[in-house]
Amino acid sequence: MSVDPMAYEAQFFGFTPQTCLLRIYIAFQDHLFEVMQAVEQVILKKLEGIPDCEISSIQTRKCTEKFLCFMKGRFDNLFGKMEQLILQSILQIPPNILLPEDKCQETNPFSEEKFQLLKQEIKELQEKYKVELCTEQALLAELEEQKTVKAKLRETLTFFDELENIGRYQGTSNFRESLVSLVQNCRKLQDIRDNVEKEGKRLETQ
């Protein structure tokens, strides 16, 4: 069988010419075996009708196999010539013929060098895309962080507004004075808590 892949012919026919010829070869070979088996059965029946025949069925089988090998050799020789003729004259697309789907190659030829350049360009674009994707993810993470900081800042401003309102309620309009007053009140509360704890411990020891 031919070792030429004949890829262009396979694209057109939908099968490789070698595969087609291999199936034909197997079909002919199977038919030859079947014919020889039928001939052998006929010979054996004819021999059974001959009285005192010295030819046994084993001898008949050996002769049949020998003849089959001879026929197979002749068939292989003829099929090899037929295969060469079919592959070169029937199932081969001439080199100057383009399939309809490849007509664009005639007006826009694409060399191996251009193909490699295109692959390199695609690779560079993929790398740029990965960098852009990482940058986008970093920006999104930073944006989420800014949202968190903004929320905390709002909480802090709200807290200071509440402190200022407390100062106004106590008659202090200045924020610094309100903060000082708040600190003093906190210290007073701490002193009261300490005194309560001491008094509680003293009562427990009595």
Swiss-Prot record:
GO terms for cellular component: kinetochore; MIS12/MIND type complex; nucleus; outer kinetochore. Keywords: Cell cycle, Cell division, Centromere, Chromosome, Chromosome partition, Coiled coil, Kinetochore, Mitosis. GO terms for biological process: attachment of mitotic spindle microtubules to kinetochore; cell division; chromosome segregation; kinetochore assembly; mitotic sister chromatid segregation. It is found in: Chromosome, Centromere, Kinetochore. It holds the Pfam family Mis12. It comes from the Eukaryota. Residues 105-206 form a coiled coil. Its main location: nucleus. Signal peptide: none annotated. Belongs to the mis12 family. Part of the MIS12 complex which is required for normal chromosome alignment and segregation and for kinetochore formation during mitosis. Essential for proper kinetochore microtubule attachments. Component of the MIS12 complex composed of MIS12, DSN1, NSL1 and PMF1. Also interacts with KNL1, CBX3, CBX5, NDC80 and ZWINT. This is Protein MIS12 homolog. The lineage of its organism: Eukaryota, Metazoa, Chordata, Craniata, Vertebrata.
